[in-house]
């Protein structure tokens, strides 16, 4: 039995599926690299601030969700995804630069750390949800029924990879370096996204 038969692939679908799996893997790897960093930075100013961070995250999530719905209805899908991914990639570069330059323990560092904690939740709303919407658009209903299980496995593996990477290397790599690796993963997913919707 061939691989195409095992995966229920029709002629010409193998390459397209591979791109989709690598796209979602890279994206979830990027996000899962940020989550442990988010938690570490969130408590860097003390656990007493967590309730305010939770409140800020709650408000940012509501505002972000509303904004995402408005923008997705106003902008064409390709332009919307290009804008969202480009915007958040620039955000990550900004956080990387700030956390690399500002001395840890300073008030400025605490402000950036708290902002990053809330920002990661907004990243999840826009970038992750947009990815699934994009895949739903480029895959027909029939293709989705056959192939989304495989793509979902790619997302799970990406999440596991990112979390494992942080757990293994956290003693050797600083926070800005993990953010830089996340930027690379996001950049790879942007390239693959363009291959999906070209």
List the predicted regions and their residue ranges:
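Intracellular juxtamembrane helix-capping segments at the cytosolic ends
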Residues: 124-140
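Symmetry-related core transmembrane helices of the 12-TM Major Facilitator Superfamily/SLC fold
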Residues: 86-92, 176-195
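Cytoplasmic membrane-interface "Motif A"-like loop-to-helix N-cap segments
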Residues: 73-89, 172-177
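Helix-to-loop junctions at the C-terminal end of transmembrane segments
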Residues: 64-79, 164-171
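Helix-loop boundary and gating motifs at the non-cytosolic
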Residues: 2-60
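Glycine-rich segments within core transmembrane alpha-helices of 12-TM secondary carriers
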Residues: 51-63, 145-167
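C-terminal ends and interior cores of transmembrane alpha-helices
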Residues: 86-109
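Hydrophobic core of transmembrane alpha-helices in multi-pass small-molecule transporters
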Residues: 25, 29, 107-127
């Amino acid at each position: 039995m061939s691989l195409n038969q095992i995966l229920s692939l029709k002629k010409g679908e193998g390459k397209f599926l591979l791109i989709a799996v690598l796209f979602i893997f890279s994206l979830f790897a990027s996000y899962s690299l940020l989550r442990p960093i988010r938690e570490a930075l969130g408590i860097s100013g003390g656990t007493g601030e967590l309730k305010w961070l939770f409140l800020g995250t709650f408000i940012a999530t509501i505002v972000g969700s509303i904004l995402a719905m408005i923008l997705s209805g106003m902008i064409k899908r390709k332009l919307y995804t290009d804008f969202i991914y480009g915007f958040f990639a620039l955000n990550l570069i900004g956080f990387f630069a700030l956390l690399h330059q500002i001395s840890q323990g300073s008030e400025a560092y605490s402000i950036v750390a708290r902002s990053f904690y809330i920002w990661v939740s907004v990243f999840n709303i826009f970038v992750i949800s947009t990815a699934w919407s994009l895949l739903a658009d480029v895959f027909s209903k029939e293709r989705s029924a056959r192939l989304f299980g495989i793509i979902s496995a790619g997302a799970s593996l990406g999440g596991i990879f990112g979390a494992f990477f942080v757990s293994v290397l956290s003693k050797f790599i600083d926070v800005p370096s993990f953010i830089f690796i996340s930027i690379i993963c996001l950049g790879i997913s942007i390239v693959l996204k363009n291959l999906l919707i070209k």
